[in-house]
Every structure is written in C-alpha cells, then in structure tokens.
Amino acid sequence: IAQCLVGSEMCIRDRSMKRHFILHIGPTNSGKTYQALERLKLAQNGVYLGPLRLLALEVYEKMNDAGIPCTMLTGQECLEVSDSRITASTVEMLDCDKEYDIAVIDEAQMVADDDRGHSWTRAILGTLAGEIHICMSPVAKDVVIHLINLCHDEYEIREYERKTALKLEDKPFSFPQDVREGDAFIVFSKKSVLNIAGRLEENGIKPSVIYGSLPPEIRRRQMTLFNEKKTQVVVSTDAIGMGLNLPVRRIVFLEVEKFDGVSRRPLVISEIKQIAGRAGRFGLYDTGYVTALGQKNLNYLKNTLNIPEQDIDIVSLGFPQVLLTMDAPLDAIIKLWHEAKPSAPFRKINVDEILFLYGYAYKERYFIADFDDKYLLYKMITCPIDIKDRELVRQWLRYCMSYTSDISLDKPDKHSKYQGLMKYESYYKKLDLYYQFSVRVGKIVEDDWLENERDKTQAKIMQLLSKSKDEYIIRCRYCGRILPIGNSRNICSCLLYTSPSPRDTER
C-alpha cells in the first residue's frame, strides 16, 4: 500500500522503453491539441486519449477523413476499422500493456479531478509510448512535470497563446432582448437548459441543447444543428467547456453558481475561464465575447477573470488493482487503502460509490456466482453507472446475479417510472450498462440489436427535443406566469396582491 500511495505501482512498466514527453501548454482556443494531432497522424501505431466520447469521435472522423485508418474505443462502443494505425479513445480505455509509438493525452489538467482524475494520472505514468504529447492548461504544468520526473523520463515544453482575443462586455446581458446568433447560454442543470430553450422558442429563436444526461450521439447532433446554422444559439451546461468545437461568438453566463453534488457554490476561476474560453473560433470570429445576466453576475465575472489561476497542486490517485492480491475480503482491502495517507501531491479518489455497489451486491452474495473472485467482483462494482438512478442500479444487480445463466446478458427492460425525455434517457443508460457489463464479464454483445435500439432511442430523443419545450418553462405555481431567470422559489409576486385559495395553500 505504501508503494501504491506514491504512484510507484503505476510506474511499473517496461523500463527499457525511454519515453519522451512533449508538453503542449496553453489556454483554450490556442491550437495546442491541433498540433499534437498533426504529429499523431504520422504514427504507425498511435493512440489518442481524451475526456469525452465526442472528442474521441471527432478524432476518429478526422483521421479517417484524412485517409488514416482509425478505430474508436470508448466505454459505450467500439468502432473498429481494419488495418487502423490510430486508436481514438476516452482516457479510461487505455491499455497499459500495449505499446504505441506516439500517444496524445488531452485535457491533462483533469488530473486533479475528484471523479476521473486518476485516469489521467494512470495515463501519464503508465502509457507505453516512445513519444507522448500532453495537452493541458498552464495550471497543470508543474504537477504533470512532477509525474514525469517520478518515472525518470524526458520532456520538452511548447507554449501557445490564444488565437482569438477574448473580451468581457461592459453591459450586463438582458434576456431575451440581447440574444444574438452565435450565442451560447450557460446554465448548470438539465432543468435550466430546457427552461431557457423553451423561453427562446417562445421568442422565435431556435436553440440547440447540450447537457450531461443526453446520449453522446444526441449531443453531437445538437452541435451539428448549430454548426450548420439550423439553430441560432446553444443552451448548455458546463459540458461545453471541455474541448467541444463550436462556432460560438459569445458566451453568456445566465448563472454563476452551480450545484457540485454537495452544495450550491459560486463558479471557481478555472471553471469560468474554461467555459469563457470557448467564445471565438479561429478563422470564423476574430474576437470572442463574454457576458452575464445582470450586473451582479457581470461584476463577479469581471473580478474573477482578472484573478490569475492557481497552479494545480494535487493529483488524483485511483485504487491500485495490484492490491487485489492481498489475502482479505475486497471491501476490507478498499477500506484499508482508503484510510492510508498518500504522499504529496497525490489525493485518493472517493470510493463511496464503489463501496455502495459492493454493499448492494453483498446482500445478495449467495445468489452471485464467484462472489469471492475479487478480480471479477471489482470489475462489477467499478462498472460506471449513475447510482442515483435506482432503476439502473437494480438492472446492474440483476446482471451480477444472472451473468452466468447464458452467453449473453438479458436485454434491458423498456418499462420505466419516468416519462418523456427522462424515460428515453434512462433507457439509453440501460443500453450502455448492457454493453459495459457484458464487456467486463466477457459476455457476447448482440451488436445488431444494440445498435438498432440505440438508433431508435436516439431518434425518439431527437423527436422530443424538436418539439415545443413550453412544458419545461418554469412558471409560477399559483398564477402560471413565466418566472424571471434564476428564481428558485417557483412563485412570483402574485401572492402580494391576491390571497391564495385553500387548495393552493395546501399545495
């Protein structure tokens, strides 16, 4: 455990391979990833490791369009191309036992992320490639160099400047009077995205929508509508900040606070700069603009954008699977590792969700074949699912209990307590779970059926998104009036002038 807490276990690799790192350091819209990908095109056996399925898909398409055979590999799917020279994948899919001649690790400032940062740590320490390009924000420079030095590898630095100017507007944004084509409106929940989209439609403005629970292919189609000017604006959560290439002229923060899973808090400097940096696109807009709804929010942006970002001083460390060789139950090993203190700059991932799924499975351990097989059980409890979706958790448990009964897993149940968009988004998550769990436990995936179900579900979601979003507009629960953006009480001033009926009071 002590060795694992200083990253030593993750550096165990072919020491005869001398790795050379090229660090591409710069802000958003500086061309750093473009330069790394140009080098990747020359690889005979290369890999791209990015944060999003959409970015892996973008690399996959660009490579194949350029006549370079490229396969895409993510947790949701594998698009295999014969004789491929490049693999475009999400960072979690890295095979640390496979050798490459050139690798690209994108958005490496994510190394400090509480939930996924350990995958970047693993990639930097464990990728087997003679030439590794790392693209990152300047704040990650020192900590990434620290990781490289742990492995006694060489590196060189290439720094980039932003290619388009970024300007904070003097006046606060007024909705909907100030809406312009090319705007991207930033809010921080699905509910808010659909609320704003509905308000825009009320004013004759066609929006694309992007939020986390949308299937990746739907997000891509929504982006395509905006790229092709079939929609005039975008309404998005902070998903827009992670390298998505959109022709955005202006970023409009309608909110400057977000719920982070624990509490509602103001956006931090890095979040604001990452999102604001998406404004302006080289070759299309010479200047990107940033503004906010209301003077108070604009003042917050103005003060925050002038503050230098603090360098990252932590690195996320994942659970080392080498510990599974210990002679102890799996939950005891995980808890023991969790209680141990790592050396700086490492910070261990939160294992609460892993232990939650372990506890869920433990209750049914007598019905789960090979429950004592720690390697297999670890694969099961680390299957990425939304534990807040209890339908999904129940499906996961059914798979744990029945995976040995046939060559393929049972197909997901279409029935759901949810309605509308949420029903189909939840079903799509079930399809993803069917695929991921099958791959983890070595079951045969019925690819044709899965592709057909995904296509039908995506078509239904697109159909629902193309309809009027009036039902999502947040209104006063008493008088039905549209509420001001940011109103969190779901009531307006109507109660100041009229007395609510007894029925309303009961509600």
Predicted regions and their residues:
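Conserved RecA-like helicase motor core of SF1/SF2 enzymes
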Residues: 240-278
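Post-DEXD/H (motif II) to motif III coupling segment of the RecA-like Helicase ATP-binding lobe
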Residues: 113-158
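Accessory helical-bundle/CTD segments and flexible terminal tails appended to RecA-like ATPase motors
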Residues: 311-475, 482
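Inter-Walker segment of RecA-like/P-loop motor cores
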Residues: 67-96
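Single conserved hydrophobic/aromatic residue that forms the stacking wall/gate
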Residues: 2-7, 12, 497-507
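Conserved strand-helix element at the start of the C-terminal RecA-like helicase core
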Residues: 46-55, 181-198
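Conserved segment of the helicase C-terminal RecA-like domain
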Residues: 271-302
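Interdomain hinge/linker at the junction between the two RecA-like core domains of SF2 helicases
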Residues: 145-177
